[in-house]
Regions:
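Catalytic nucleophile-loop/oxyanion-hole region of alpha/beta-hydrolase
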Residues: 45-46, 189-198, 209-248, 380-389
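Short beta-strand/loop motif that positions the catalytic acidic residue
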Residues: 331, 336-339, 343
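Primarily recognizes the serine-hydrolase "nucleophile elbow" in alpha/beta-hydrolase
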Residues: 26-30, 230-293
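Short beta-strand element of the alpha/beta-hydrolase
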Residues: 174-184
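N-terminal cap/lid segment of alpha/beta-hydrolase-fold proteins
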Residues: 23-54, 58, 121-172
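Catalytic active-site module of serine/aspartate enzymes centered on a nucleophile-bearing elbow/loop
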Residues: 384-403
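Hydrolase active-site cap/lid region
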Residues: 111, 115-130, 262-315
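Conserved alpha/beta-hydrolase "acid-adjacent" motif
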Residues: 344-350
Length: 403
């Protein structure tokens, strides 16, 4: 009976080993199709937990074998090899973390200066104390209470209601502002999409305006940027009664929202924009169409056709106008660009090239690449990648808006 129990336990551990290996593979393997993207995005973010899981399997195997009642040398050898592979894969992000953080630190110091962190202690006390806090991977990142006003109508073009959310610190005051633009391939999303980040950053002393825009494929560019500009005009007209300091404003966007944020910040906004934060945003839409990544989980060409209403051959001027790289000039807002090295939706090479062009034009630019991160890595808000990104995002915003 004991031998049967040990055999069952061994096979059960084998199943767990394969589960751990399957999840760990997605740390390095990009998603070939959209439905597998959650695995490719999520696995690196929970990799410290996978390390613990994968290490426990050979330990439990050893416990069973130490009883001496069940011997399968070949099975043991295969199991140990697979366990070793799973452990190596799951440890990869943690091994790379220190190097990635050091590179990020060098980039921000090179652009903003050694004294960029000379900020009031009342502000720094609210920030992340470290680029990675292991306990927060499981316990979550704390977010103090803030005041939230949702579903405020700011425009109604063609009978389509466009709304925004306003996030404000708990105490009444006059605060710098952050305009937040969600992503979603220009086809989906709403002002609640980045709710966790918006609440978190508002608690540090900002008024966050989470805006919306009309979606493709029903509406093609430039409708989306027109809606964003209309939202900025609304913010300008309602700053006084929403505790918003219009002299200190930044724009942040993710993916498609970052493309719109860059255009809004770089092309004559209705009021001065001090800073731009771009999370994995498309930079050159013509190049993105002509040189699609492999694999291509969102079918990039179909996505761009839905957004722009054609191809670079049929609507070349729209592709040019929609590409932030063509808006680069001198005297632009300081820019923080954050991309994932594993991203096969918006490859990090485009962010790197944008950073080079911005710097060449004399603009303060911070480029951070997170080697193991996929597109939308911050969907796992307390994950490894977002902890690193958040650490520098909050410091960059404080430098730009408060210092």
């Amino acid at each position: 009976m004991k031998k049967v129990t040990n055999a069952i336990g061994t096979w059960f551990l084998g199943i767990l080993l394969l589960v751990g290996l399957f999840l760990s593979i997605w740390i390095v393997l990009p998603a070939p199709i959209f439905s597998l993207l959650p695995l490719s995005v999520g696995a690196p973010e929970i990799s410290p937990g996978l390390i613990i899981f994968n290490v426990s399997i050979p330990i439990l195997y050893w416990v069973i074998l130490s009883r001496g009642d069940y011997h399968q040398p070949k099975l043991l050898f295969i199991g140990l090899c697979l366990s070793g592979l799973a452990i190596i894969l799951s440890a990869a992000p943690l091994i790379q973390f220190s190097s990635a953080q050091q590179q990020a630190q060098r980039s921000i110091v090179a652009s903003l200066g050694e004294d960029y962190l000379k900020l009031p202690s009342s502000l720094t006390d609210k920030m992340r104390s470290q680029p990675l806090i292991i306990s927060d991977l499981w316990g979550g990142i704390p977010s103090p209470k803030v005041r939230i006003d949702r579903d405020i109508l700011f425009a109604n073009p063609d009978g389509v209601p466009l709304t925004l959310n306003i996030y404000r610190p708990a105490q009444v005051g006059n605060y710098p502002a952050i305009v937040s633009i969600y992503g979603g391939a220009w086809q989906r999303g709403n002002p609640d999409s980045d709710d966790t980040f918006n609440r978190y950053i508002a608690a540090q002393g900002y008024v966050v305006w989470a805006i919306s825009y009309r979606h493709a494929p029903t509406y093609h560019f430039p409708i989306q940027i027109e809606d964003v500009r209309q939202a900025l005009t609304y913010i300008q007209n309602h700053a006084a009664d929403t505790e918003t300091n219009l002299d200190r404003v930044a724009i942040i966007g993710r993916s498609a929202g970052a493309q719109l944020a860059m255009l809004a910040a770089y092309q004559d906004p209705p009021f001065p924009i001090r800073a731009l934060v771009n999370y994995y945003g498309p930079v050159n839409l013509t190049a993105g169409y002509d040189d699609v990544p492999t694999p291509d989980p969102i079918e990039s060409r179909a996505t761009l056709r839905a957004f722009l209403g054609g191809t670079p051959q049929t609507v070349p001027e729209l592709y040019r106008q929609a590409s932030p790289i063509n808006a680069v000039k001198s005297a632009l807002p300081a820019s923080l660009l954050i991309y994932g090295g594993k991203d096969h939706i918006v490859e990090s090479k485009y962010g790197s090239y944008l950073a080079q062009q911005l710097r060449s034009a004399g603009n303060q630019t911070v480029f951070i690449e997170i080697p193991w991160a996929d597109h939308a890595f911050d969907a796992v808000f307390s994950g490894m990648s977002n902890q690193l990104a958040l650490y520098y995002t909050e410091r960059f915003l404080a430098w730009a808006l408060v210092k």
